[in-house]
């Protein structure tokens, strides 16, 4: 079907998307009450990840999702739009942010109740064996937090392998 953008997993991004960037920037301007940090290290093909969630509001439930994604995958891409000259197949198209693995349930794992509440900190470690066919220099880690009651993202953070992040919270 026709490619569709979803803003914050809630609303369809109005077509044509380049003319409606305000839908996205309005969401980005909202205050985040969740802080995230991703720290990782690599030993051979073994990736160790530490994800931290700092909570600045009294939520009832929260879920954390952690994904492994890869950039710069080159494959042909069907084109159903007038973009790129309207050709039907984009040869050697460079794909970014391709989901390679979900280290949690795809919709996130629920945080323990004792870790949900104002000024609480939750921390979880993950390990992942990167398949030899993947390009380690193109791998990124994405973590996001949702309320247990919806799929809306409260905050999201991405990191390259080896990044050391501190929690950023407004």
Language-model regions: role of each:
Residues 1-170:
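Short, conserved sequence motifs used for protein processing/export or organelle targeting and
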């Amino acid at each position: 079907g026709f490619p569709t953008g979803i803003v914050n997993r809630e609303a369809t991004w109005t077509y044509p998307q380049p003319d409606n960037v305000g839908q996205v920037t309005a969401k980005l301007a909202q205050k985040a009450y969740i802080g995230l940090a991703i720290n990782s290290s690599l030993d051979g093909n073994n990736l160790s990840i530490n994800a931290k969630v700092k909570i600045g509001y009294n939520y009832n439930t929260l879920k954390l999702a952690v994904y492994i994604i890869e950039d710069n995958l080159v494959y042909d891409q069907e084109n159903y739009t007038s973009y790129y000259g309207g050709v039907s197949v984009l040869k050697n198209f460079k794909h970014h942010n391709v989901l390679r693995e979900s280290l949690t349930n795809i919709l996130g794992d629920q945080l323990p109740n004792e870790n949900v509440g104002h000024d609480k900190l939750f921390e979880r470690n993950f390990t992942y064996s990167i398949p030899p066919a993947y390009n380690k220099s193109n791998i990124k880690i994405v973590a996001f937090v949702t309320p247990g009651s919806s799929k809306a993202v409260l905050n999201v953070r991405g990191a390259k392998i080896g990044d050391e992040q501190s929690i950023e919270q407004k």
